[in-house]
Amino acid sequence: MRILIPILVLIAAIDLYINYGRVNSSVAEAEQSAALVQIEIPSELSGLATIGKRGFDKNCAACHGENAVGKDGVAPPLVHKIYEPSHHGDESFQRAVAMGVRAHHWKFGNMPAIEGLTRAEVKAITAYVRELQRHNGIN
């Protein structure tokens, strides 16, 4: 029993080291990737979209890029015709956050569910993305 505890501690330490490194390298790669589209930023946002921008920056930008322009090799731009409201309605954003998304338009891989966001927070984030889209001719 005395030898079992140090072995378990060693295994846990190795696991932590391996997984911590993976998470940090994924975040670092996401931060360094180039934008996939160039967009114009609206000079003003509605109140809901302003709240949504804060939520997007905190929860989405690491993968989808600042102002939803995507990141090469990481995640697609959300300011893109594929995500226009007639093809991906607002509820699709809710479902993506709640359940994740199987890759179907892009070759970035699957998107995991995002924990900790309420429907109201996702609604605000969606409002932000929609205002960016409209400002860039995506209706």
Residue ranges of predicted features:
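Short glycine/proline- and charge-enriched loop/turn segments
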Residues: I3, S33-I39, P76-V79
